[in-house]
Amino acid sequence: MEIFPAIDLKEGRCVRLYQGEFSKETVMNEDPVAQAIIFETFGAKRLHIVDLDGAVAGESLNLSVIERICKAVRIPVQVGGGIRSLVSVEKLFSVGVDKVILGTAALYDKPFLEETVRLYKEKIIVGIDAKNGFVATRGWLDVSEISYIDLAKQMEKIGVQTIVFTDISKDGTLAGPNVEQLELLQKNVATRVIASGGIASIQDVKKLNDMNIYGVIIGKALYEKTIDLEEVLEVTKLC
């Protein structure tokens, strides 16, 4: 199982949100580059970065910070948030990003998604964020009428190999992941699934590992120290 420490960027800082609410923000580190280096120092093999400003604006607004992070660490970095054009995708790859996560564009711009998957194959990940089982977009501000399962099936047909699934109601809560929704997702698609939202303990991670979940994104639990990064990396290595 892959462990992805999370860095959420807002106005150039590393923050955490509660249930996706921009008004419920906590600054975790004023310097996200320093935070990335900390994660790498403690053994992280990869990083998950979300440009929250970009997710709302529809274009990357923290590109310079992302570039500095990519230059500061030697581990692969995957980035999502506001990536809705081929130019944005190419810019991220040009500054050293390893994989790009598409969210809103996956729902509303299928030709763009198909083209990026054709060009970059496994380097393109789709992020599916769900609220009460329905896909949320544009920085979680809009909720669609399409179920997360239906969108996942569409993504699989297009050739997407990896999906990041987030249950928004769990995000930033330390309430544990939505196991039921993850199980349903696993039953319906054969794509790799990276779980995000609510991870609070080593036990949560072990449970997801037992479900054959490909990867886990851990944010608040690392900052609040309910999960020790070195320990969880060791545990998943032994599983």
UniProtKB/Swiss-Prot annotation:
Coiled coil: none
Known pathway: Amino-acid biosynthesis; L-histidine biosynthesis; L-histidine from 5-phospho-alpha-D-ribose 1-diphosphate: step 4/9
Gene Ontology CC annotations of this record: cytoplasm
Record's signal peptide: none
Name of the protein: 1-(5-phosphoribosyl)-5-[(5-phosphoribosylamino)methylideneamino] imidazole-4-carboxamide isomerase
Active-site residues, Swiss-Prot/TrEMBL: 8, 129
Entry keyword annotation includes Isomerase: yes
Keyword tags: Amino-acid biosynthesis, Cytoplasm, Histidine biosynthesis, Isomerase
Catalytic activity: 1-(5-phospho-beta-D-ribosyl)-5-[(5-phospho-beta-D-ribosylamino)methylideneamino]imidazole-4-carboxamide = 5-[(5-phospho-1-deoxy-D-ribulos-1-ylimino)methylamino]-1-(5-phospho-beta-D-ribosyl)imidazole-4-carboxamide
UniProt EC number: 5.3.1.16
